[in-house]
């Protein structure tokens, strides 16, 4: 999810397929696929990353090229994932071994995607179709619009526009909330964790949970994680856009 800068994402074993994303764009990267990314813009960049299934996938699997190039810089990756920097005098601890590069047979087990296949994994800011789902909290529909962005294709009431990256489900949904002026969701709660990532604009936030109340204003790049069951409201102060990440493949509807 690109917040700032222009980012090149590339994939497959040969790293030759690519696409460039700009601020507000989002990409859903499939599991079991080599990928990389780099800031190709002229300003300092920043991306948000969402990992599915409440874990990091058991660690990172590095392409052979990465391990070999690291050696050229004096860096040795160990089998346990730790990094040894020989340029500052570090040595491989006793009993530890360098991570061997993957064999051609192992490399052949990774999935390969064409640009056309990956196009279904990319969402472009400004191109989303408004959601027709009636369960979103919205007291100002004239100024507040929701979008179904990432989620299962068979989700009831939603028409997600970006394909999930995991064939077994990501265990999260991503929605967009856009304001053309001041607005208000009204107070609501969810039985799942909900994270709000502000792309642009200012949003007044109120959150009540276990006897405590938080009132704050989020601006460009700010994040808030709403606990399960917390009562919250979101009030844009003007034009803006934010992503809402909700846990679960099929989360329950918000309660108002």
Features from the language model and the residues they span:
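Double-stranded beta-helix
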Residues: 34-121, 231-256
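Conserved short histidine dyad/triad with adjacent acidic residue
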Residues: 158, 173-191, 228-229
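A short, N-terminal "cap"/entry segment at the start of jelly-roll beta-barrel domains
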Residues: 77-178
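Tight coil/turn sites that cap or link beta-strands
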Residues: 24, 30-32, 179-184, 220-221, ...
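A generic structural motif
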Residues: 4, 32-34, 42, 182, ...
